[in-house]
Amino acid sequence: MMYFVYLLSILLVLGFMAFASKPSPIYGGLSLVLSGGVGCGIVVSLGGSFLGLIVFLVYLGGMLVVFGYTAAMATEEYPETWVDSTVFTNLLIMVGMLGVIWYYFSGEVDLSINYDLLDLGGVEVLGGDYNGVSLLSACGGWELIFSGWILFLTIFVVLEVTRGEH
């Protein structure tokens, strides 16, 4: 299972590097959506099934609309892909910087996997995500109400900004 998490972590870093190499907005949005799915897969494989599902639904439900809108507004006749020279050069520079940082902080380049990721000393009846939801409703109830109120006001601000001159 840890090999799977390790593979997903590598895919997450590669997805963020694919976004940071500045391709066309269409490909940038695609790499962010795929990276979000991989990140939620990491959370699910580490035991946070509820949290991973909620983040996946919120991320893809909310942000996919934004990505679709920006991709429609920023259409190009010849979009830059990941194999174009400037984008590929940026990607190679980031891979080189990642290798230098890895070498600098580790002292040597060593491909080892730390299996002691979570310290599970005792038996847990509930996962951390269920405890977090119950704490949000109990101790953090005022934060939940405040966040809902802010979102409610945001709707009115957006409607006022986008309102026509009629």
UniProtKB/Swiss-Prot annotation:
Ranges annotated as spanning the membrane: 1-21, 26-46, 47-67, 87-107, 139-159
One GO CC annotation: mitochondrial inner membrane
E.C. designation(s): 7.1.1.2
S-S bridge residues: none
Function as written in the Swiss-Prot or TrEMBL entry: Core subunit of the mitochondrial membrane respiratory chain NADH dehydrogenase (Complex I) which catalyzes electron transfer from NADH through the respiratory chain, using ubiquinone as an electron acceptor. Essential for the catalytic activity and assembly of complex I.
Assembly description: Core subunit of respiratory chain NADH dehydrogenase (Complex I) which is composed of 45 different subunits.
Protein name per its UniProtKB record: NADH-ubiquinone oxidoreductase chain 6
Source organism per UniProt: Ornithorhynchus anatinus (Duckbill platypus)
